[in-house]
């Protein structure tokens, strides 16, 4: 509205340009001084005067709570929209909780926790797998099939030690298949059987005063090297020529 009134009430006049020479010769164009005449009064009010008289209308506050339902129903029929309830106030509504509401919420939370963690709610002990605890085999446990941590010392029973001694008496070295059979029969792990046989072989060598295989291999290598060196020295002495006598 402001833009249109500005265009109407402005004193700006669009300039007009003289036509071609042929129109000037015919006398259709007036004197050029007529183009710069004072603009005529168009009869419209200027900027200081309002275009329309201002009315005494006062805008009243709109109550959102008193919206008629009929208008919403008519609008919904035309545009397939469902009317929605309008809140009475823009602020949050604080309602007093009924008696036992907190208890109901707490029981609901407990039921959800019991569904997520059934073992904790029912008081059952958590499942502990064999690899989660240190095992010291003091009794024969047929149900145990797990391993043993590296730094734990195994206490063998008399029955286990006797069976291992019998096996060592016949075979000081075990194959993989036989080691698996012994471990399964005695409720031990393969590593336990392997370590027991290693310790038992070292003890047997000490009892029979047998040298260690590693020490014996190193000593044999050193003796062979020294023998080769002595042989080279002897061959060098044989190749040295004898000096000629001065008298001859």
UniProtKB/Swiss-Prot annotation:
Motif Antp-type hexapeptide per UniProt: ranges = 128-133
Q: Main subcellular localization, coarse class?
A: nucleus
Q: Which InterPro entries match?
A: Antp_homeobox_Deformed_sf, HD, HD_metazoa, Homeobox_antennapedia, Homeobox_Antennapedia_CS, Homeobox_CS, Homeodomain-like_sf
Q: Where is the composition biased (Low complexity)?
A: 217-238
GO BP annotations of the record are: anterior/posterior pattern specification; embryonic skeletal system morphogenesis; positive regulation of transcription by RNA polymerase II
Q: Which UniProt keywords apply?
A: Developmental protein, DNA-binding, Homeobox, Nucleus, Transcription, Transcription regulation
Look up the domain of life of the source.
Eukaryota
Q: Where is this gene product found?
A: Nucleus
Report the GO molecular function annotations: DNA-binding transcription factor activity, RNA polymerase II-specific; RNA polymerase II cis-regulatory region sequence-specific DNA binding
Q: Which residues bind DNA?
A: 149-208
Disordered: region residues: 23-107, 207-248
By its UniProt entry, which Gene3D superfamilies does this protein fall under? Homeodomain-like
Q: Where is the composition biased (Basic and acidic residues)?
A: 35-51
Give the UniProt entry's GO cellular component terms: nucleoplasm
- Write one Pfam family the protein is assigned to: Homeodomain
As for family, the record states: Belongs to the Antp homeobox family. Deformed subfamily.
What does it do?
A: Sequence-specific transcription factor which is part of a developmental regulatory system that provides cells with specific positional identities on the anterior-posterior axis.
Name recorded for this polypeptide: Homeobox protein Hox-A4
Which organism is this entry from?
Morone saxatilis (Striped bass)
| Gene designation | hoxa4
């Amino acid at each position: 509205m402001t833009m249109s009134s500005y265009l109407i009430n402005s004193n700006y006049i669009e300039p007009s340009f003289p036509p071609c020479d042929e129109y000037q010769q015919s006398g259709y164009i007036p004197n050029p001084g007529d183009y710069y005449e004072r603009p005529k009064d168009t009869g419209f009010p200027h900027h200081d005067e309002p275009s329309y008289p201002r009315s005494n209308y006062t805008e009243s506050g709109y109550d959102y709570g008193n919206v008629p339902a009929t208008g919403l129903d008519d609008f919904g029929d035309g545009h397939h929209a469902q009317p929605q309830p309008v809140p009475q106030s823009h602020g949050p509504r604080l309602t007093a909780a009924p008696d036992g509401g907190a208890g109901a919420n707490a029981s609901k939370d407990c039921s959800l926790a019991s569904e997520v963690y059934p073992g904790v709610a029912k008081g059952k002990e958590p499942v502990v797998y064999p690899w989660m605890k240190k095992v010291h085999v003091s009794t024969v446990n047929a149900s145990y099939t797990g391993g043993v941590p590296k730094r734990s010392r195994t206490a063998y029973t008399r029955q286990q030690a006797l069976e291992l001694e019998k096996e060592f008496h016949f075979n000081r070295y075990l194959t993989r298949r036989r080691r698996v059979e012994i471990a399964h029969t005695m409720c031990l792990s393969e590593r336990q059987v392997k370590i027991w046989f290693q310790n038992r072989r070292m003890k047997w060598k000490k009892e029979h005063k047998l040298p260690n295989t590693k020490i014996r291999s190193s000593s044999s290598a050193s003796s062979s090297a020294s023998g080769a060196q002595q042989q080279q020295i002897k061959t060098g002495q044989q190749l040295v020529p004898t000096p000629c006598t001065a008298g001859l």
